[in-house]
């Protein structure tokens, strides 16, 4: 991993499959990653799942912080993830970044 990639701006994103499943990931470019997933060149978990919809994304800081946030989101229940999608809390990522900077 290059120094630039490690410290660039990373985003957390959530996609919904046609079956209603939610997928959480991180990337430096949400549009590019969406296109990769749609083309079947993204995560194996999404291959063959049909049309994907971006339902949430937010800035997550550097790669390390993005990975930590992704892990925390993946530990949530389906109903908790649905609440995130419904509420669209941009503060989720901001609060996580602030806690990291002050801690």
From Swiss-Prot:
Tell me which domain of life the UniProt entry assigns to the organism this sequence originates from: Bacteria
Q: Which CDD domains match?
A: GIY-YIG_UPF0213
Q: What Pfam families does UniProt report for this protein, alphabetically?
A: GIY-YIG
**GIY-YIG domain sequence ranges:** 8-83
UniProt lists the family membership as follows:
Belongs to the UPF0213 family.
* Record-given protein name: UPF0213 protein ECA0725
- Which organism's genome codes for this protein? Pectobacterium atrosepticum (strain SCRI 1043 / ATCC BAA-672) (Erwinia carotovora subsp. atroseptica)
């Amino acid at each position: 991993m290059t120094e630039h990639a490690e410290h660039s701006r990373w985003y957390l994103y959530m996609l919904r499959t046609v079956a209603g499943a939610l997928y959480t990931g991180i990337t430096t470019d949400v549009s590019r990653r969406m296109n990769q997933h749609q083309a079947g060149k993204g995560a194996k978990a999404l291959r063959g799942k049909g049309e994907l919809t971006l339902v949430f994304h937010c800035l997550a800081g550097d790669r390390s912080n993005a990975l930590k946030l992704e892990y925390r989101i993946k530990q949530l229940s389906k109903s908790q993830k649905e609440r995130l999608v419904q509420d669209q809390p941009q503060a989720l990522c901001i609060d996580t970044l602030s806690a990291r900077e002050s801690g």
